[in-house]
Curated annotation (Swiss-Prot):
This is Phosphomannomutase. The keyword DNA repair does not apply. One of its GO terms (molecular function) is phosphomannomutase activity. The active site is at S106. CDD domains: PMM_PGM (cd03089). Binds 1 Mg(2+) ion per subunit. Pfam families: PGM_PMM_I, PGM_PMM_II, PGM_PMM_III, PGM_PMM_IV. Its cofactor is Mg(2+). GO terms for biological process: carbohydrate metabolic process.
Length: 469
């Protein structure tokens, strides 16, 4: 029986579907998403869909409801079971399925969960996600007799991951899965890549008892840093909750941030793809874009968001893209989706074959002073108003000699450095950053941000740190 369904107004987001389980996101929502094969385009969707889920406590229930919805509209479902999101992406490509659907809360708090989707080879985002709400509200489905079966794709995924391991010497590596879906099974790199491995928190536990699985927050890397120091590791690798974002530590215990990793990868990729377009999001350090150009590549600044970067890669034929958040995408030898396990294999191979420590690769980039990604809570309406107000001053800023990029918020660059204000597409927050080569100039750029928008007195614009972040 087809019944109209209404989603909570907060769950249909720009890049995915997410909410608080039992409050804004329920099994009924998952089943409604499963009914996506609606009357308006039944011929556009082939019969097979891959479905997977992460290690959150609510994920099995949501996965079962999703499969129920897909089967109810006549689709054949390949259930890949528990594992990281990239394994679901791989299964969808490997089996040439019509779509892939992942139940995952990614790096959100334990009481959250969500749904990431791909249609064919591309991500589902923006208007496509909002369309799901319109379809469900009208009960605009087709009915049919579908089916489902279990698919064990893990061995094939691991084999394909390891095919691009081109290291020439063994390393000592610490791994922190954060009790997320990259632990236990398949856990390929931390058991199959040659070398010595130190494993942290690889038991999958949706309570996340040791630390939150977000390697872009430095406090979540404390245990990994300690393991690197204790065991004399060459590299420390951290994963987020569903294995599509990577964090890294060098042998000195320093964090190698997402944009620094992209610069390291770009040096390798551009050897086989000279002059290629390398994409990074608007939050990334200017040193990354300068380094890509120095290496002979074509740097392209683009909107933040894993779905948006994947789409831009496909449009431009880029072999590499990445975000400051640790979403990194290879399309030179890989499939163009964000896979932290694959990124780990490539990073280990680079350090091994170049016979250089990760710290030296990191230190090729110049020192800068910058803020981390700073978020200020504002209303949904106000966050866009602030950005529009700054955009309205673009002519004056350019007349003063600044370069203004409004591809995603407002990024203003002058002789001293740059500052950014953008509205988050997933939360009621404004995102701000500032970066310069000297502390004095950096203080001036921070003042520019404050002049254009007064942050709350309780949350001053943050102190800087050496090296890009």
């Amino acid at each position: 029986m087809s019944e109209a369904h209404t989603f909570h107004p907060t769950v249909l987001r720009e890049y995915d579907i997410r909410g608080i389980v039992g409050s804004t996101l329920t099994a009924a929502d998952a089943r409604a998403v499963g009914r996506l094969r609606h009357r308006g385009r039944p011929a556009a969707v082939r019969k097979t869909v891959c479905v997977g889920y992460d290690g959150r406590l609510s994920s099995p229930e949501l996965e079962a409801a999703m499969v129920d919805g897909l089967v109810a509209c006549g689709l054949h479902v390949l259930r890949i079971g528990l594992g990281p999101t990239p394994m679901l992406y791989f299964a969808t490509r490997d089996r040439e399925a019509a779509a892939g659907i992942m139940i995952t809360g990614s790096h959100n708090p334990p009481d959250y969960n969500g749904i990431k989707m791909m249609l064919g080879k591309g991500p589902v985002y923006g208007r496509q996600i909002l369309d799901i709400g319109a379809i469900a509200s009208k009960a605009d489905y087709v009915s049919g007799e579908g089916s489902s079966e279990q698919l064990d794709i893990k061995d094939a995924y691991v084999e394909r991951l390891l095919r691009d391991d081109d290291g020439t010497r063994d390393l000592t590596i610490a791994w922190d899965a954060g009790n997320g879906a990259s632990g236990e099974d398949p856990a390929p790199p931390d058991r199959e890549v040659p070398g010595k491995h130190v494993l942290l928190f690889d038991e999958i536990d949706g309570n996340f008892p040791n630390h939150h699985p977000d390697p872009t927050v430095e406090k979540n890397l404390v245990d990994l840093k300690a393991a690197v120091a204790e065991h004399g590791c060459d590299i420390g690798i951290g994963f987020d909750g569903d294995g599509d974002r990577i964090g890294a530590i060098d042998h000195l215990g320093r964090v190698v941030w997402g944009d620094q990793l992209v610069a390291i990868y770009a040096a390798d990729v551009l050897k086989s793809h000279p002059g290629a377009t390398i994409i990074a999001d608007v939050k990334a350090s200017q040193t990354l874009f300068d380094e890509i150009a120095r290496l002979g590549g074509n740097p392209l600044m683009w909107k933040t968001g894993h779905s948006l970067l994947k789409a831009k890669m496909a449009e431009t034929g880029s072999p590499l893209a990445g975000e400051m958040s640790g979403h990194i995408f290879f399309a030179d030898k890989w499939y163009g989706f964000d896979d932290a396990l694959y990124c780990a294999v490539r990073l280990i191979g680079l350090v091994s074959k170049l016979n250089q420590p990760l710290s030296e690769l990191r230190d090729r980039l110049p020192d800068v002073v910058n803020t981390p990604e700073t978020r200020f809570q504002v209303s949904e309406e106000r966050k866009f108003q602030v950005v529009q107000e700054v955009e309205g001053r673009s002519s004056r800023l350019m007349a003063e000699g600044a370069d203004v990029n409004d591809i995603d918020g407002v990024r203003v660059k002058d002789a001293d450095g740059w500052w950014l204000l953008r509205a988050s597409n997933t939360q009621d927050v404004l995102v701000a950053r500032a970066e310069s080569g000297t502390r004095r100039s950096w203080e001036r750029l921070k003042g520019m941000v404050v002049a254009h928008w007064k942050p709350p007195a309780s949350r001053p614009f943050l102190r800087g740190r050496r090296q890009l972040h």
